[in-house]
């Protein structure tokens, strides 16, 4: 990573970048929503594309001089369509939350009912949490998981849908280790006349690799982030499998009168000028690069290894007496309920950080602790797999995590963390990342 100019011009920021580079290269990243982009993606994101304003869409901009950023955006859109096998893509959302906001704004009016997975059961803020716009502008109702299994019960989903009759059902999660039955969700939505949105921000990379069920044929809208398992730059995206007339009946004037706008037209207008102005063209260029990478055969090998590593870790944790919510994992993550280990999520996160392992504390279903403490931790394998780690490494990592958690209430905990940190550093240095070396 070439930083010689930054070092000369701004030593304080340079130092922060150096320290973050050391953290990423010499400690173990197990946060399920994080990954490492390629050097090509980073170069695109750090390119002259960052200088260009480009309000509007390719061929229909409000600014001149957009002919080359148009190329980048068209590449991103075309590659995403091929990757997800969809007919419509908007690559301009700055984040997954922005993408979700655009969808909700495009089909709902304030006060309309929505239904999504409860945040404390593994959902996301934008699926109806009362602290988020989605729970403040709309009447939000939440489905959850069964206490006995930790899994979503479609009978419970249907019962709630019939009771509250939402206009939009959201299926997706940020801390749920099983898959979603998109076909069953669509059948429920159709029976009550609701629209269906899939938020696949977490498993998108596994979905395009064919390792999890595809939401595009079943859902009216599909949103995702472009990082996480897709391994691109931080950003969002909206997709549709097919177009249809917008349900709000928004019209547009024509030479002969007016017509109802198609949903894709409404969606584009909701992203810009609805909730955003100028798109981040350097990030869109990075998205285009990442989508090309995900279209290569080796990306499926990567995604398959992500899933294998997660399965091995889940099995190893279970053998050591840990409780995994839902009983295991079918994707890239797992949620550990630490209550039988007499350690809360906050303590575990802090001790593992001290030991060179980055995870995040996370509420578990029916948690009796606050979101700032929690009873669990969330663990994911995308970043470690990008480094080239495999099943044997996964088992070793679980053993190291167990050493730290088991020592949490003992006088030896600091020594244990220090020794584990040394082992983690050695493991990480055995799996270096191309392009992450500092070259001032």
From Swiss-Prot:
GO cellular component: cytosol
Protein name: Serine hydroxymethyltransferase
Gene name of the record: glyA
A GO biological process held by the record: glycine biosynthetic process from serine
Free-text function comment from the UniProt entry: Catalyzes the reversible interconversion of serine and glycine with tetrahydrofolate (THF) serving as the one-carbon carrier. This reaction serves as the major source of one-carbon groups required for the biosynthesis of purines, thymidylate, methionine, and other important biomolecules. Also exhibits THF-independent aldolase activity toward beta-hydroxyamino acids, producing glycine and aldehydes, via a retro-aldol mechanism.
Residues annotated as binding (6S)-5,6,7,8-tetrahydrofolate: 119, 123-125, 370-372
Pfam family membership, one: SHMT
Enzyme Commission (EC) number: 2.1.2.1
Domain of life: Bacteria
Residue list for modification N6-(pyridoxal phosphate)lysine: 228
Keywords from the UniProt entry: Amino-acid biosynthesis, Cytoplasm, One-carbon metabolism, Pyridoxal phosphate, Transferase
Localisation per UniProt entry: Cytoplasm
Pathway: One-carbon metabolism; tetrahydrofolate interconversion; Amino-acid biosynthesis; glycine biosynthesis; glycine from L-serine: step 1/1
InterPro entries assigned: PyrdxlP-dep_Trfase (IPR015424), PyrdxlP-dep_Trfase_major (IPR015421), PyrdxlP-dep_Trfase_small (IPR015422), Ser_HO-MeTrfase (IPR001085), Ser_HO-MeTrfase-like (IPR049943), Ser_HO-MeTrfase_PLP_BS (IPR019798), SHMT-like_dom (IPR039429)
Broad enzyme group: transferase
Chief place where the protein resides: cytoplasm
Reaction(s) the record says it catalyses: (6R)-5,10-methylene-5,6,7,8-tetrahydrofolate + glycine + H2O = (6S)-5,6,7,8-tetrahydrofolate + L-serine
GO MF, one annotated term: pyridoxal phosphate binding
Requisite cofactors: pyridoxal 5'-phosphate
Sites annotated Plays an important role in substrate specificity: 227
Subunit structure: Homodimer.
Protein family per UniProt: Belongs to the SHMT family.
């Amino acid at each position: 990573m070439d930083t010689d100019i930054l070092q000369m011009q701004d030593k304080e920021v340079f130092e922060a970048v150096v320290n973050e580079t050391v953290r990423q290269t010499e400690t173990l990243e197990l946060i399920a929503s994080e990954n490492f982009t390629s050097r090509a993606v980073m170069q695109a994101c750090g390119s002259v594309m960052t200088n260009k304003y480009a309000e509007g869409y390719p061929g229909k901009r409000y600014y001149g001089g957009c002919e080359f950023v148009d190329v980048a955006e068209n590449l991103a859109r075309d590659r995403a369509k091929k990757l997800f096998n969809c007919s419509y893509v908007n690559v301009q959302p700055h984040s997954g939350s922005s993408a979700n906001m655009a969808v909700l704004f495009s089909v709902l009016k304030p006060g309309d009912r929505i239904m999504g997975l409860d945040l404390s059961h593994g959902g996301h803020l934008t699926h109806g949490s009362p602290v988020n716009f989605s729970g403040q502008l709309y009447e939000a109702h939440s489905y959850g998981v069964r206490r006995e299994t930790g899994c979503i019960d479609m009978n419970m989903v249907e019962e709630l849908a019939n009771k509250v009759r939402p206009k939009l059902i959201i299926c997706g999660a940020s801390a749920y280790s099983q898959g979603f039955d998109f076909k069953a969700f669509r059948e429920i939505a159709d029976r009550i006349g609701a629209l269906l949105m899939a938020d696949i921000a977490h498993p998108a990379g596994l979905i395009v690799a064919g390792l999890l069920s595809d939401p595009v044929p079943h859902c009216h809208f599909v949103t995702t982030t472009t990082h996480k398992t897709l391994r691109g730059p931080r950003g969002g995206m909206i997709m549709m499998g097919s177009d249809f007339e917008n349900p709000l009946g928004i019209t547009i004037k024509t030479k002969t009168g007016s017509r109802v706008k198609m949903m894709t037209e409404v969606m584009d207008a909701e992203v810009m000028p609805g909730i955003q102005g100028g798109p981040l063209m350097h990030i869109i260029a990075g998205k285009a690069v990442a989508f090309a990478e995900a279209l290569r055969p080796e990306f499926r090998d990567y995604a398959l290894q992500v899933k294998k590593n997660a399965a091995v870790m889940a099995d190893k944790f279970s053998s050591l007496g840990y409780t995994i919510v839902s009983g295991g994992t079918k994707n890239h993550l797992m949620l550990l309920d630490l209550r039988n280990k007499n350690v809360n999520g906050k303590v575990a996160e802090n001790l593992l950080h001290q030991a060179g392992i980055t995870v995040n504390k996370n509420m578990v279903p029916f948690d009796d602790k606050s979101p700032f403490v929690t009873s669990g931790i969330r663990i994911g394998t995308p970043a470690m797999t990008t480094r080239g780690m495999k099943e044997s490494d996964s088992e070793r990592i679980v053993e190291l995590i167990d050493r730290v958690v088991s020592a949490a209430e003992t006088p030896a905990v600091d020594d244990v963390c220090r020794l584990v940190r040394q082992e983690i550093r050695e493991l990480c240095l055995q799996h270096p990342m191309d392009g992450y070396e500092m070259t001032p």
